[in-house]
Amino acid sequence: MLLLERTKLVVEGAGAVGVAALRRAATVPAESGTTVVILSGGNIDTGVLADIARHHETERGRRLRVFTTIPDEPGSLAALLTRLGEGGANLIDIAHVREAVALSVGQTGVELVMETRGPDHTERILATLSEGGYSAKVLD
């Protein structure tokens, strides 16, 4: 992920061994001159790459998945989304869950996936939801 984030290069695991060795100090660069590390291979499944990126964002606190309930009436979803906007959340995906054992009559569930700026922003979003009367359960 380091190479992808910093250099925008897609390099398969074996092709990044030189960078890994330098980062772990397993190899010491020459005292004079320039050290060159060869990067090779971009043979990676794009679906796997997307999964890795999502996992990395979640791990770094830049992706938040929550489940909450809202009244099953017109305007409830709009009110929830307005609240999220006030918290600066960037909505990536939403699922409207109408049928679940845990839901009471007159309620509907909403699963939200949001992009955040980091752990502090995640906490602010959760606080904004709580202040708005929403009980949000963070999902893995």
Language-model features: where?
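Active-site-adjacent helical/loop segments in soluble small-molecule enzymes
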Residues: 1-33
